[in-house]
Amino acid sequence: MKRVVILGGGTGGAIVANQMVRQLHQEVDAGEVELTVISNVEQHVYQPSFLYVAFDLAIPADAKRPERQVLDRRIHLVEGEADRVDPGQHQVIMSDGMELPYDFLVIATGSRPVPEDIEGLVEGGHHFYTEEGALKLRDALQSFKGGRVVLVVGVPHKCPVAPLEFILMLHEWLDGRGLSSATHIVYTYPIGRLHSLQGVAEWVGPVFEARGIECRTFFNPEIIDPVARTVTSLEGETLSYDLLVGVPPHLGHDVIARSGLGDSGNWVPTDRHSLLMQGRDDVYVLGDATNLPISKAGSTAHFQADVVAANIVNRLRGGYGSLRYDGKVFCFIETGLNEATYVTFDYERPPAPVASGSLLHLYKLAFNRMYWLSTAGIL
């Protein structure tokens, strides 16, 4: 029997597992191939929903389903914490000592926000990257009566356009509550332009200007003083705030560090086209877990899962697994509460947002609902 273990049951892990079981249904049903997903959570979460939770446009329950329900019944689900990966012995060791051998391993451990890495952010600010954070931000917005709103961005972080979406949704949300004239919004970004993607930066500049949103670049948040309500950057600039919203920096999963497989951020060195872990021909990496200099987004994991699933299936059947990932990413961008745009790009083509509109916003909402078909490997 050939064994494929998928470490991580998030977007990338679920998609790659469900795609493989569909493509290998004969081998799986015959007991020739076994697929196992390791998940350290019981609930599968559609994390982009938390942005809508912050504006009271969704509830957390809309974003969650049991992990067992997300996976095909023929996929073995191991719920628990993986202690480490041992590539030399071709196995994953669980925290309870269970050993899971593999012929192929897919690392899809994702990323996690670490707001504590910015001094004072936990005590003095808010974010929307977890259920708890989104609910606290929702409460803060509901009681907000005006003042200075400052958004700061830590790097790296998942969903590259989320800071822009929050600011543009906030602007329209404040206008709808009659608070626009009483509020000053300040958008900061850690590099010398408004976004890491040049095309997105060029697009959003005039959009922010038309809405009267102040922008500060080269602003890397270092210290937040919750009492004085100030945030000071690594560059030495200090801004005052009445409401501070942060995009927390992210790290890879601790199992990567315990296994000695990653860099200082727990990102796994990965070939940009084959998605094989560098130095191994039996370990694939996808989604946020890679060290690739591309957007950490759900669509990235999806497009990579297509390649990884097809290549593992091909190799299990005696082929070479020669499909290549081209760096494709697709992101909707909410430009308010009722309009959106999108960008698509890859290693060769830079992003260029199209004109925003209400129809694209409806597409975005439809995509949110169809996410569960995506994880099932149907879309």
Give the location of each predicted region.
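Beta1-alpha1 glycine-rich phosphate/pyrophosphate-binding loop at the start
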Residues: 1-76, 156-198
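FAD-binding core/adjacent interface of flavoenzyme oxidoreductases
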Residues: 3, 75-165, 172-176, 245
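Glycine-rich, N-terminal phosphate-binding loop of Rossmann-like dinucleotide-binding domains
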Residues: 9, 96, 109-110, 235, ...
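Internal hydrophobic alpha-helix adjacent to the cofactor/substrate pocket in enzyme cavities
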Residues: 17, 172, 301-327
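A Rossmann-like FAD-binding core segment of flavoenzymes
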Residues: 32-36, 75-92, 100, 174-270
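FAD-site-proximal beta/loop scaffold in flavoenzymes
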Residues: 121-145, 238-306, 310, 314
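Flavin (FAD/FMN) cofactor-binding core of flavoprotein oxidoreductases
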Residues: 194, 227, 324-341
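C-terminal auxiliary extensions adjacent to catalytic cores
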Residues: 339-379
